[in-house]
């Protein structure tokens, strides 16, 4: 028997969370790209025999996997403590012990671009990712879904002949389109974009409305919508790239897809970024921000933060907003500079702000919500969460 584990080609991943949603034991975490490597450390430390090593045959080869016997589990947590990659956890929701791979291969089957494999047993050809060298480029992978169009803060993207077209005279190269593209078809500055986190809150089909025309099945670029021939209905996946081509093509509006996107990342991996969305800590960070660039939504328990994309500086007709520089720890960072005496309160900056942090205000400071990179918030975050990063300067 051999120890084989699931592998994911990280650089090609769409971050659609389909594999994570499909995994019955929560052995995949896409945000951190952690996958159970079947090291069997959890089995070794389990004091009750609830976790056992088991032999399974896959494609004629004998492999080892972890089996969980819930009736023996005392929820002691020793397995989670022993896990070297931190994917194992124990809680009160069944199955109590999670994060071990059972080699069910559901993740392999559901991946829309076939980048998940079981090396030596189920091999998928490695996808070569070669970002175009242009400042910004839309590749042939574009499916014409239009998800990028409303996300652009300066309205530089249109759809022409079912493909995204970028007006380079308007584009500010903030990379929000690349971060948001469901099918990895947009690249900025020749780099593979860091994708925005995505949560499919709801993906349902109305059985009474569905006429079984299968147009949604045909249009799905990843073949992720399945057919129930017996009941004459389609079955959407638990999670997917969420391009909404299926929703748009449905002639009877039978599909309901609700998606929540996280805030965009900074233009590069450098700058002030939220590492962990700890609402209470971030709320304290917001309280010290001199320009109120961290906005707290108490109702939704969400926090938005200026990402210094520069969209406001491009939209400003008076020159009141500029993209400046500031040095921290010997390194130069972008920041937003505001000259109140030049501001005529036209509100154009507010309209284009992708994070919706900018807002007009009365008094000596007519505009709030832009980041000056003073790092007061970072000081609070480090004080409140010792040993655990909530904010980070990269």
UniProtKB/Swiss-Prot annotation:
Residues at which [4Fe-4S] cluster binds: 13, 16, 19, 23, 36, 39, 42, 46, 73, 76, 79, 83, 101, 104, 107, 111, 142, 145, 148, 152, 171, 174, 177, 181, 210, 213, 216, 220, 240, 243, 246, 250, 306, 309, 312, 316, 343, 346, 349, 353
UniProt keyword list: 4Fe-4S, Electron transport, Iron, Iron-sulfur, Metal-binding, Repeat, Transport
Record text on cofactor binding: Binds 10 [4Fe-4S] clusters.
Pfam families: Fer4_4, Fer4_7
Gene3D superfamilies assigned: 3.30.70.20
GO molecular function: 4 iron, 4 sulfur cluster binding; metal ion binding; oxidoreductase activity
Cofactor requirements of the protein: [4Fe-4S] cluster
Boundaries of every 4Fe-4S ferredoxin-type domain copy: 4-33, 26-56, 64-93, 92-121, 133-162, 162-191, 201-230, 231-260, 292-326, 334-363
Name of the protein described by the UniProt record: Polyferredoxin protein VhuB
Gene behind this protein: vhuB
């Amino acid at each position: 028997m051999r120890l084989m584990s699931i592998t994911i080609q990280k650089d090609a991943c769409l971050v659609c969370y389909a594999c994570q949603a499909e995994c019955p034991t929560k052995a995949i975490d896409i945000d951190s790209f952690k996958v159970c490597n079947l090291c069997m450390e959890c089995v070794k430390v389990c004091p009750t025999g609830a976790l056992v090593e088991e032999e399974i045959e896959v494609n004629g080869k004998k492999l080892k996997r972890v089996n969980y016997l819930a009736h023996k589990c005392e929820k002691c947590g020793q397995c989670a403590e022993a896990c070297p990659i931190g994917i194992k956890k124990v809680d009160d929701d069944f199955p109590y012990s999670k994060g071990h791979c059972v080699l069910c291969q559901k993740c392999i089957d559901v991946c829309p671009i076939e980048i998940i494999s079981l090396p030596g047993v189920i091999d998928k050809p490695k996808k070569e990712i070669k970002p175009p060298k242009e400042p910004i480029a839309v590749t042939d992978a574009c499916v014409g879904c239009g998800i990028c169009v409303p996300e652009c803060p300066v309205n530089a993207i249109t759809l022409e002949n079912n493909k995204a077209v970028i007006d380079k005279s308007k584009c500010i190269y903030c990379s929000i389109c690349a971060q948001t593209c469901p099918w990895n078809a947009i690249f900025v500055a020749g780099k593979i974009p860091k994708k925005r986190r995505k949560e499919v809150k709801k993906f349902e089909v109305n059985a009474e409305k569905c006429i079984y025309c299968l147009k949604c099945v045909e249009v799905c670029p990843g073949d992720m919508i399945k057919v129930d021939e017996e009941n004459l209905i389609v079955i959407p996946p638990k999670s997917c790239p969420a391009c909404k081509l299926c929703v748009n093509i449905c002639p009877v509006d039978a599909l309901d897809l609700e998606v929540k996107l996280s805030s965009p990342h900074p233009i590069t991996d450098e700058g002030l970024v939220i590492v962990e969305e700890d609402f209470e800590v971030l709320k304290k960070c917001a309280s010290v921000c001199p320009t109120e660039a961290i906005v707290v939504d108490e109702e939704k328990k969400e926090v938005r933060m200026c990402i210094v994309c520069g969209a406001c500086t491009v939209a400003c007709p008076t020159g009141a907003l500029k993209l400046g520089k500031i040095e921290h720890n010997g390194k130069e960072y972008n920041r937003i500079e505001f000259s109140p005496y030049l501001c005529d309160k036209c509100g154009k900056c507010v309209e284009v702000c992708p994070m919706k942090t900018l807002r007009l205000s009365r008094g000596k400071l007519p505009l709030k919500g832009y980041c000056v990179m003073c790092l007061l918030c970072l000081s609070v975050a480090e004080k409140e969460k010792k040993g655990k990063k909530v904010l980070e300067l990269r």
